[in-house]
A protein has these predicted regions:
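Short, glycine/charge-rich beta-strand/loop segments that flank catalytic centers
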Residues: 80-83, 114-126
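Short, charged, amphipathic alpha-helices and their helix-cap/turn boundaries
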Residues: 160-164
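An aromatic/glycine/proline-enriched structural segment found at the starts
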Residues: 104, 108-111, 125-128, 145-153, ...
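M16 family metallopeptidases and their MPP-like homologs
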Residues: 1-103, 134-158, 180-186, 236-247, ...
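Non-catalytic, conformational "gating/processing" segments within enzyme and secreted inhibitor domains
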Residues: 110, 114-118, 132, 136, ...
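Short, solvent-exposed amphipathic alpha-helical segments in soluble enzyme
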Residues: 199-203, 258, 276-278
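Short, surface-exposed beta-strand/loop micro-motifs that present aromatic residues
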Residues: 169-174, 223-231, 288
Length: 385
């Protein structure tokens, strides 16, 4: 949604639209065509139509308008649970910012699509260059089999070869409705003073029927076979163990957060940290993937190189996890870890970018702001029991 609307990003939308409609129709035909020669002819036709449509486009006009009103960092990202459009701006331009962004969401036009598709290809190639990306996606496809989390966010090469602008528009019409979106503002904002501005701008966005999310059941990890993933790193060996974990709406999530902090933390005083600090392994870490509907914690380890044993490294990590399960740690260690986690939670709220991310996750996952503010207190209340 960066290419403008029927009012932004075009010199004459009435003349541009027939060309855009023709391009959309051609992409839908391309997706149905398997013959390489026929595909080549269609792609050349798309290129010809795109050149004609481009005569009416004003590239980056939306971005330029945002910048002219003090906006910076205009960007977006898609995760497994949400798509987020974001930027910073000067508060004195709140009215202009609301006008532009509400207009953007009300009537987007998917122009300059050919160039945008090339950008997505470049992004996918960039991910492919990350040697850990493919093993991670392979693991996720097994761990989250049968759920949307099993699929790559950016899609497969086959998906990108056969885009359908018609399906994109259907997706927009279905999901980009007021009751399926959240507006998040953080910084120098007085909610009472801007409520009328918000109502007169974002209040124009249509509502729609939002399907209730269906719960899904994941297979117990013990029923999954051991996976062997090849990392393209000479000499270095690595391994990992994955556990199911509570989600952030569960009553035991804060206790789990403390348990994870006892394994490793920002001060590197955890039970797994000690393995690395004592040079018993090259690397050991426990990290969670807190999705909205499920959560897993992965314990990753790298034995010392060049002759360290992967089995021995795994055994030492499991021993540290067993210590945690048995409560084989001091009260001082527990209390200092809780204090560290409380401090981290508070400091995250003091940084505007971190706070925006926390607010986004809370809104997406159905958490109240009170849940967020009480996190430090809830962590402090966690006991050994």
């Amino acid at each position: 949604l960066f290419k403008g609307t029927d009012k932004i990003g075009t010199v004459d939308y009435a003349k541009e639209k027939p060309w855009l409609d023709s391009i959309a129709a051609k992409y839908d035909i391309l997706a149905e065509t398997k013959d390489a020669n026929k595909r080549n002819i269609i792609q050349k036709d798309i290129n010809r139509l795109s050149i004609k449509a481009g005569e009416y486009a004003i590239p980056n006009e939306f971005s330029s308008l945002i910048t002219s009103f003090g906006g910076t960092g205009l960007n977006a990202f898609t995760s497994f649970d949400e798509t987020v459009f974001h930027n910073s701006f000067s508060p004195q331009y709140i009215h202009q910012w609301c006008e532009l962004n509400s207009e953007r969401l009300m009537s987007p036009v998917f122009r300059l699509f050919q160039g945008e598709l090339e950008t997505v290809y470049e992004e996918k190639n960039m991910y492919s260059d990350n040697m850990l990306m493919q093993p991670a996606e392979d693991a996720e496809s097994k761990i989250f089999a049968g759920t949307p989390y099993a699929y790559s966010i950016i899609g497969s090469t086959e998906n990108l070869k056969n885009p359908r602008l018609g399906e994109m528009k259907e997706f927009y019409n279905k999901y980009y409705v007021a009751n399926n979106m959240t507006l998040i503002l953080t910084g120098d904002v007085n909610a009472d003073s801007i409520s009328n501005i918000l109502e007169n701008t974002f209040g124009r966005i249509r509502s729609g029927k939002v399907e209730k999310e269906q719960p899904f059941n994941l297979k117990p990890l013990k029923d999954l076979a051991t996976m062997k993933l090849k990392l393209p790193i000479p000499i270095v060996k690595a391994g990992g163990i994955v556990y199911r974990a509570p989600i952030d709406r569960d009553s035991d999530y804060n206790a789990f957060t403390v348990a994870l902090g006892l394994l490793n933390n920002s001060s590197e005083t955890g039970l797994l940290d000690s393995l690395r600090n004592d040079n018993k392994v090259m690397y050991a870490i426990a990290m969670m993937s807190p999705f909205k509907e499920t959560n897993v914690v992965g314990v990753g380890f790298v034995p010392n190189i060049p002759f360290g044993s992967r089995k021995k490294a795994e055994r030492m990590c499991v021993e540290q996890i067993e210590k945690l399960k048995k409560g084989d740690f001091s009260d001082d260690f527990l209390n200092s870890t809780k204090l560290l986690l409380e401090k981290d939670a508070q400091e995250n709220l003091e940084n505007i970018d971190n706070r925006a991310n926390i607010m986004t996750t809370a809104a997406s996952h159905g958490l109240s702001w009170k849940n967020v503010l009480d996190k430090g207190k809830d962590i402090a209340a966690v006991s050994r029991e």
